[in-house]
Amino acid sequence: KDIYDRVEWACVEEATRALAGKKTYDTWQQGFLQILQSLQKDKVFYINVYHSISREYIEQYLYKLTYDLMIGVVEERAAGMSVRAEDKEFIAHFYKYAFVGLTLEWIRGGMKEAPAAIVERVSTVTHGGITNALEACRIGD
Protein backbone atom coordinates (compact mmCIF):
# COMPACT_ATOMS: atom_id res chain seq x y z
CA LYS A 1 0.00 0.00 0.00
CA ASP A 2 2.85 2.43 0.71
CA ILE A 3 4.02 2.40 -2.91
CA TYR A 4 0.48 3.17 -4.09
CA ASP A 5 0.24 6.07 -1.64
CA ARG A 6 3.61 7.39 -2.83
CA VAL A 7 2.61 7.11 -6.48
CA GLU A 8 -0.70 8.85 -5.86
CA TRP A 9 0.93 11.61 -3.81
CA ALA A 10 3.68 12.15 -6.39
CA CYS A 11 1.15 12.32 -9.20
CA VAL A 12 -1.11 14.81 -7.44
CA GLU A 13 1.82 17.06 -6.51
CA GLU A 14 3.21 17.06 -10.04
CA ALA A 15 -0.22 17.65 -11.56
CA THR A 16 -0.82 20.72 -9.45
CA ARG A 17 2.50 22.24 -10.45
CA ALA A 18 2.38 21.21 -14.10
CA LEU A 19 -0.98 22.71 -14.96
CA ALA A 20 -1.07 25.84 -12.82
CA GLY A 21 -2.62 28.45 -15.14
CA LYS A 22 -2.08 26.41 -18.32
CA LYS A 23 -5.54 25.24 -19.31
CA THR A 24 -6.27 27.62 -22.18
CA TYR A 25 -6.05 27.33 -25.95
CA ASP A 26 -2.89 29.45 -25.96
CA THR A 27 -1.18 27.59 -23.09
CA TRP A 28 -2.23 23.92 -23.39
CA GLN A 29 1.02 23.06 -25.16
CA GLN A 30 2.98 24.43 -22.23
CA GLY A 31 0.80 22.45 -19.80
CA PHE A 32 1.30 19.21 -21.78
CA LEU A 33 5.03 19.92 -22.02
CA GLN A 34 5.26 20.37 -18.26
CA ILE A 35 3.40 17.10 -17.68
CA LEU A 36 5.96 15.29 -19.85
CA GLN A 37 8.88 17.13 -18.26
CA SER A 38 7.67 16.26 -14.76
CA LEU A 39 7.44 12.60 -15.74
CA GLN A 40 10.89 12.73 -17.31
CA LYS A 41 12.37 14.41 -14.23
CA ASP A 42 11.52 11.28 -12.22
CA LYS A 43 12.05 8.98 -15.21
CA VAL A 44 13.29 5.92 -13.30
CA PHE A 45 10.44 6.13 -10.79
CA TYR A 46 7.70 6.43 -13.43
CA ILE A 47 9.16 3.76 -15.71
CA ASN A 48 9.36 1.38 -12.75
CA VAL A 49 5.81 2.22 -11.69
CA TYR A 50 4.61 1.80 -15.27
CA HIS A 51 6.11 -1.69 -15.47
CA SER A 52 4.77 -2.70 -12.06
CA ILE A 53 1.29 -3.57 -10.89
CA SER A 54 0.67 0.10 -10.09
CA ARG A 55 0.67 1.14 -13.76
CA GLU A 56 -3.03 1.84 -13.38
CA TYR A 57 -2.18 4.73 -11.03
CA ILE A 58 -0.16 6.44 -13.74
CA GLU A 59 -2.91 5.88 -16.29
CA GLN A 60 -5.62 7.27 -14.01
CA TYR A 61 -3.41 10.23 -13.09
CA LEU A 62 -2.74 11.02 -16.75
CA TYR A 63 -6.40 10.63 -17.72
CA LYS A 64 -7.56 13.03 -15.02
CA LEU A 65 -4.78 15.52 -15.64
CA THR A 66 -5.22 15.54 -19.39
CA TYR A 67 -9.03 15.72 -19.23
CA ASP A 68 -8.79 18.73 -16.91
CA LEU A 69 -6.41 20.36 -19.37
CA MET A 70 -8.52 19.61 -22.45
CA ILE A 71 -11.95 20.46 -21.03
CA GLY A 72 -10.59 23.91 -20.15
CA VAL A 73 -9.46 24.38 -23.74
CA VAL A 74 -12.73 23.03 -25.16
CA GLU A 75 -14.84 25.28 -22.92
CA GLU A 76 -12.77 28.31 -23.89
CA ARG A 77 -13.06 27.57 -27.63
CA ALA A 78 -16.82 26.90 -27.26
CA ALA A 79 -17.50 30.33 -25.77
CA GLY A 80 -20.36 31.93 -27.68
CA MET A 81 -21.25 28.66 -29.45
CA SER A 82 -24.33 26.55 -28.84
CA VAL A 83 -22.76 23.15 -28.22
CA ARG A 84 -24.23 20.44 -26.01
CA ALA A 85 -22.26 19.67 -22.83
CA GLU A 86 -21.97 16.00 -23.80
CA ASP A 87 -20.41 16.97 -27.14
CA LYS A 88 -17.84 19.18 -25.39
CA GLU A 89 -17.08 16.36 -22.98
CA PHE A 90 -16.71 13.91 -25.87
CA ILE A 91 -14.21 16.20 -27.62
CA ALA A 92 -12.19 16.58 -24.41
CA HIS A 93 -12.23 12.80 -23.86
CA PHE A 94 -11.15 12.19 -27.46
CA TYR A 95 -8.07 14.37 -27.04
CA LYS A 96 -7.44 12.96 -23.58
CA TYR A 97 -7.17 9.43 -24.95
CA ALA A 98 -4.89 10.53 -27.78
CA PHE A 99 -2.55 12.45 -25.48
CA VAL A 100 -2.46 9.76 -22.79
CA GLY A 101 -1.89 7.03 -25.38
CA LEU A 102 1.11 8.92 -26.75
CA THR A 103 2.40 9.57 -23.24
CA LEU A 104 2.10 5.93 -22.18
CA GLU A 105 3.88 4.80 -25.33
CA TRP A 106 6.63 7.34 -24.58
CA ILE A 107 7.00 5.96 -21.04
CA ARG A 108 6.92 2.37 -22.34
CA GLY A 109 9.74 3.24 -24.76
CA GLY A 110 11.95 4.66 -22.03
CA MET A 111 11.13 8.37 -22.52
CA LYS A 112 13.77 8.78 -25.24
CA GLU A 113 12.11 11.49 -27.33
CA ALA A 114 12.39 15.04 -26.02
CA PRO A 115 9.12 16.28 -24.48
CA ALA A 116 9.26 19.49 -26.55
CA ALA A 117 9.44 17.44 -29.77
CA ILE A 118 6.37 15.42 -28.76
CA VAL A 119 4.38 18.54 -27.91
CA GLU A 120 5.39 20.20 -31.18
CA ARG A 121 4.24 17.18 -33.19
CA VAL A 122 0.96 16.93 -31.25
CA SER A 123 0.36 20.65 -31.74
CA THR A 124 0.95 20.35 -35.49
CA VAL A 125 -1.39 17.38 -35.87
CA THR A 126 -4.18 18.80 -33.69
CA HIS A 127 -4.03 22.44 -34.84
CA GLY A 128 -7.59 23.66 -35.35
CA GLY A 129 -9.08 20.27 -34.50
CA ILE A 130 -10.95 21.34 -31.37
CA THR A 131 -12.50 24.37 -33.07
CA ASN A 132 -13.48 22.28 -36.11
CA ALA A 133 -15.07 19.64 -33.87
CA LEU A 134 -17.02 22.29 -31.95
CA GLU A 135 -18.20 23.89 -35.21
CA ALA A 136 -19.42 20.48 -36.40
CA CYS A 137 -21.35 20.00 -33.14
CA ARG A 138 -23.03 23.42 -33.09
CA ILE A 139 -26.75 23.33 -32.38
CA GLY A 140 -29.13 25.17 -34.70
CA ASP A 141 -26.61 26.97 -36.85
Q: PLM ranges: what are they?
A:
Residues 55-80, 89-101, 131:
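Amphipathic alpha-helical packing segments from all-alpha helical-bundle domains
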Residues 1-4, 38-40, 44-49, 53-68, ...:
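Basic/polar phosphate-binding segments, predominantly the helix-turn-helix DNA-binding elements
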Residues 75, 89, 96-97, 105-141:
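C-terminal peripheral helix-coil segments that are non-catalytic and often amphipathic
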Residues 25-44, 93, 101:
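Amphipathic alpha-helical segments that line or abut small-molecule/effector binding pockets
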Residues 18-22, 46-49, 77-80, 106-110, ...:
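Secondary-structure edge/capping motif, primarily at the C-terminal ends of alpha-helices
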Residues 82-83, 127:
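Cytosolic nucleotide-binding catalytic cores of signal-transduction proteins
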Residues 1-10, 55, 128, 132-141:
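N-terminal intrinsically disordered, cationic/polar leader segments
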Residues 1-20, 33, 40:
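An amphipathic alpha-helix adjacent to DNA-recognition modules
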